[in-house]
């Protein structure tokens, strides 16, 4: 359907907006049915929305109170958090300020979630309309982008779901290429778009630049000399706009440096990449994935982190179109083949640094060198499919507008392809508790009082409730990209993160943490209290059931014995306890006639020799799929490089363990222990420990050890001791030495 004139364009735009709005309402109908003021998009599957709800409240609050918007001590109190390393969406927060002020941040979040698919689809529609000059094909193209598998998977991540800028960037470039807008207007619009995109998601800002550069390079390669000459003008002006955006954003960008995470990424990109099968087989994010065969297949295969790559039958059209393009063979530039090439590049990069098939790593991929570049290595390849769906949206619009083909073929094939990717509804659940929504907390708390809300971090919703209170209280905890070092150094924090706080000495560990962070109250939702009742009972205070929560006022006398406790001292106590438990478990494991080669945390747990809180869960290999690591790990040159990175704290402990010369196998766990064979007659026992704890462990057990590593795989040396994140303290003992090791508790001075 081609429509000429202003009236036709307005009619097409109105039809597109109406269709997308209806589709958005259907996609988010669980939230609308429950009530925009009470339900939360993404709940109960995810607690991630609290980050965005908090951000929507924080930026207006910070600006109106004259606070630094990129730093807060209202979470992770009293030390605070650098918000440059968060996903708190400052641009949408400022846009929604009036609504947040009137109705609260939960309503703002839900409205943005409702608007997001429509807005993203509409900007893609505009791009497709520019490319095809046909309304109906453009409407289909916009739908494919705005209601893609990616959009459904990221629906509860507003920083990733607000994807209306990338189509605008492409359209501005094409308008300038066709000389339909002037130089200054193009530069200003590109500058504004890039700046807004950064303030929504620095990750999409970076990847949009990368894939934009790839698209331009591919066009340069395919095009003839005349086209390349035309390409220079928008390329030059885009570069100017990018430079201006970087300058304007430099105060924000400056806050990224130095990275608190070293050279290694926050999350391993190999663990959040697209699986080859993920492009073919649907997940429960698509209606096709709800079919019985798809559910069975999904359980067997598993698609890993953020499985957004399912494209249904859309790539079939792209391939068909590429091999039978509209362009005549004499023409040098085929838009269809260009788009197919671009889609292929995006798919390959979305596979990440390691290609996975049904969750099994099979080979390194071309994204591997990106791991060498800080900031860039934090981009998760599974999210690159965003640009694949944008490419497909334009491809499908072109296909539908190709009058050379049979009209029934075009529309029936496209309809089948669109049906194959139709998303399921985004879940929603009640996200309010009367204690917070009805302001009951004002009767129990003072302004700026520090509270601890359980469950902790991403297991709970502390930041959401703090935002709903208008930042009435501070929170000892929070949930952003990572837990700050000054929190993570307390042993109870990793235990709470694992949602299993009952580690050795948990009562004292909990009270010491509360004392150090000036916590005067603990709040637990009534529905979660059973899991934490034993922990809260250590406070010896009355549990008050009010407004859907259990409120516990902390008695200062209970915490008084821990007033001078430090994280280092509690870490030392904790690891002395753990090391003794591991020695005892090893001794009993071998004493029962088990083979040394079968010793690991999980075999000991199965025999009842280790509690689940000590044993932890199996760790996911950080270097899985990098075959050269296993080949060269024992070489002196490789170990020299690894030692330099580890000694300068450029990589974290889990990767450091795998870069060592010894094959770890099942000996380590998520709880931060190492227990297993070292040689045929020697065992390795280790714990994640800070420098003070490591020194104490060495003094107590070192005289009977054959070797001591800290941080592993480096030999123990006091010259490397520093107040940093816990590292693996590993000791090697001969089996014959086990009976001589003292496992009895020893009080600290």
Walk through the language-model features, giving the residues of each.
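Hydrophobic alpha-helical membrane-interfacial segments at the cytosolic entry of transmembrane helices
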Residues: 13-21, 192-193, 229-253, 266-271, ...
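Membrane-embedded helix bundles of polyisoprenyl
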Residues: 20, 112-131, 135-222, 238-253, ...
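Extracytoplasmic
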Residues: 265, 415-749
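Hydrophobic/aromatic-rich transmembrane helices and adjacent perimembrane loops
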Residues: 310-313, 362-403
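Hydrophobic, aromatic-rich transmembrane alpha-helices
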Residues: 217, 244, 311-350
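Membrane-interface coil-to-helix junctions
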Residues: 23-120, 143, 148-164, 272-297, ...
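Periplasmic/ER-lumenal interhelical loops and adjacent helix-loop junctions
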Residues: 43-62, 234, 242, 247-323, ...
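Start-transfer (signal-anchor) and selected internal transmembrane alpha helices
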Residues: 1-31, 236-243, 330-340, 749
